[in-house]
Amino acid sequence: MKSLIRPLVVLFVILTAVTGLAYPAVMTVFGQAVFPSQANGSLIEQDGKVVGSALIGQPFDAPKYFWGRLSATAPMPYNAAGSGGSNFGPLNPSLPDQVKARIAALRDAGTDLSKPVPVDLVTASASGLDPEITPAAAAYQVERVAKARHLAPDAVAQLVAANTTGRQFGVLGEPRVNVLKLNLALDAAQAAH
């Protein structure tokens, strides 16, 4: 029996050192050396201060800003600790009522509802933390943002186009617009205007 315990303890110590210490240390050094921005959370700085992350959505509700997908992390919006699925299923009888309420909130905010509302403006994402919207959702908001900022809609649409990211490697995912980056670009453009 004693002859079995010693090899087990040695194996335990070796595996703990390799998987618990060496591997995480090597991956941390590799990440910091090769992907420093991503390894540190893809933080976005403005004037030397961190204003957010390109990976986590932020609440924007002023008419002069583009709005992202709804957060599903109540009661604190965009709380990464509360991330998780939140949308009702397509057969849930509460889904139409929830979507109608969100459309009414858009109307109350002065949004022109004569065009179809992009689905990502009235539903939350799977995580409830999405930092990006579709180009259609951004285009839908151009008039409201331009009016609130006293800018030409074409100038705002150009900023949307400049902040639209295509499919990864040309085939993965869909084109998307990072709301935080777009709103920072809007602030910079208006300050320069």
From Swiss-Prot:
It is found in: Cell inner membrane. Keywords: ATP-binding, Cell inner membrane, Cell membrane, Ion transport, Membrane, Nucleotide-binding, Potassium, Potassium transport, Transmembrane, Transmembrane helix, Transport. GO terms for cellular component: plasma membrane. The keyword Nucleotide-binding applies. Pfam families: KdpC (PF02669). It is a single-pass membrane protein. The chain crosses the membrane at residues 7-27. The system is composed of three essential subunits: KdpA, KdpB and KdpC. HAMAP family: KdpC. NCBIfam families: kdpC (TIGR00681), PRK00315.1 (NF001454). Belongs to the KdpC family. This is Potassium-transporting ATPase KdpC subunit. It comes from Burkholderia cenocepacia (strain ATCC BAA-245 / DSM 16553 / LMG 16656 / NCTC 13227 / J2315 / CF5610) (Burkholderia cepacia (strain J2315)). The gene is kdpC.
